C-alpha cells in the first residue's frame, strides 16, 4: 500500500539500496523517477515482464515480433529509469516438435540480435536469466549462449537459487561465467523442501561468496522474493545481510 515514494522510503529505511522495476507495469514512470531522486533508491534494473507469456522462442512469428517489441520497451524503460540492465528469459522448451531446445536457441538468438543495436544505443545491457524453462541448464550452455552474441551489451543474470535444481553448485556456475555475469539474484531453494526462505536452501553461501570474490563481482545482489509490508521486508533484509555477511 501507499505511493511509490512511500515504498521507496520504506525499503530505504530497511537498508536496501536499489530495486528493479517491471516493464510494462501500471506504475507511473515519472513518479518512480521522482521517488528515486527524492529517496536515493537506485533503480538498477528492469524486468521484461512479458517474456514468459509472449516468448521470443514461440513458433509463431507474430508472437516473436510482439515479444521483441516488449524487450525493446524494457530497454527503453531501463534508460528512462537510469537502470543498466533489462532482464530477459529468452524462451522456453515447451514442445518437442514446435518449441524444442534447438528451436528455442535459434529463434531467441535471432530476436535478441534485433534488439542489440538499441541496447548499444541506449547503453543498457540485455541480461539473460537462467530459470526453470528447460533451456539453459548447465554452465557450459550459458557461456556458449552468451558468447555467441559477441556483444558487450549482453550478459548473464545468474539466479543461484534457480540453478540448485540442476545439480551443478551455484558457485561453480559463477566461476564458469566469470565476467559474463552482469547481475546476480537469489531466493532460497532446497532439493528436499522446494522453495524456502532466503538462507535456508542448498545454495552453499560460503562457496557462492568465495566464487563472487574470485571473479571480482562487485555488482548488485537482488532478492527475488514476493516482498510484502515492513515486517516481511525487514525479514528479507536481515536474511540478505546474514547470507551476504553484511552484518
For the regions a protein language model found, what residue spans apply to each?
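Residue-level detector of anion-binding/catalytic polar loops
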Residues: 17-18, 42, 84, 125, ...
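Short N-terminal secondary-structure initiator segments
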Residues: 1, 27-41, 127-135, 161-168
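A short alpha-helix capping/helix-coil boundary motif
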Residues: 10-13, 52-55, 93-96, 123-124, ...
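N-terminal pre-domain/capping segments
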Residues: 1-79, 103, 113, 120, ...
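Active-site beta-loop-alpha junctions enriched in small/polar residues
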Residues: 22-24, 48-51, 91-93, 129-133, ...
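Active-site acidic/histidine proton-transfer and metal-coordination neighborhood
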Residues: 57-156, 165
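Active-site-proximal flexible loops/turns
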Residues: 27, 52-55, 94-96, 136, ...
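Histidine-acidic metal/acid-base catalytic patches
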Residues: 1-12, 84, 139-158, 162-247
Amino acid at each position: 500500500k501507499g505511493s511509490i515514494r512511500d515504498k521507496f522510503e520504506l525499503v530505504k529505511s530497511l537498508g536496501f539500496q536499489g530495486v528493479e522495476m517491471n516493464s510494462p507495469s501500471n506504475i507511473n514512470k515519472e513518479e518512480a523517477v521522482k521517488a528515486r531522486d527524492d529517496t536515493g533508491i537506485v533503480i538498477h534494473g528492469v524486468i521484461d515482464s512479458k517474456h514468459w507469456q509472449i516468448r521470443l522462442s514461440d513458433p509463431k512469428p507474430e508472437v516473436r515480433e510482439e515479444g521483441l517489441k516488449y524487450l525493446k520497451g524494457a530497454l527503453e524503460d531501463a534508460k528512462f529509469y537510469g537502470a543498466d540492465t533489462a532482464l530477459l528469459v529468452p524462451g522456453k522448451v515447451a514442445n518437442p516438435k514446435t518449441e524444442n531446445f534447438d528451436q528455442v536457441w535459434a529463434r531467441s538468438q535471432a530476436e535478441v540480435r534485433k534488439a542489440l543495436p538499441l541496447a548499444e544505443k541506449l547503453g543498457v545491457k540485455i541480461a539473460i536469466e537462467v530459470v526453470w524453462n528447460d533451456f539453459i541448464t548447465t554452465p557450459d550452455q550459458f557461456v556458449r549462449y552468451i558468447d555467441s552474441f559477441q556483444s558487450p551489451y549482453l550478459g548473464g543474470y545468474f539466479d543461484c537459487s534457480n540453478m540448485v535444481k540442476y545439480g551443478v553448485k551455484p558457485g561453480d556456475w559463477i566461476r564458469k561465467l566469470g565476467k559474463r555475469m552482469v547481475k546476480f539474484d537469489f531466493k532460497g531453494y532446497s532439493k528436499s523442501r522446494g522453495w524456502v526462505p532466503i538462507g535456508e536452501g542448498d545454495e552453499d553461501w560460503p562457496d557462492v561468496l568465495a566464487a563472487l570474490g574470485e571473479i571480482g563481482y562487485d555488482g548488485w545482489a537482488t532478492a527475488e522474493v514476493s516482498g510484502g509490508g515492513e515486517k516481511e521486508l525487514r525479514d528479507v533484509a536481515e536474511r540478505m545481510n546474514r547470507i551476504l555477511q553484511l552484518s
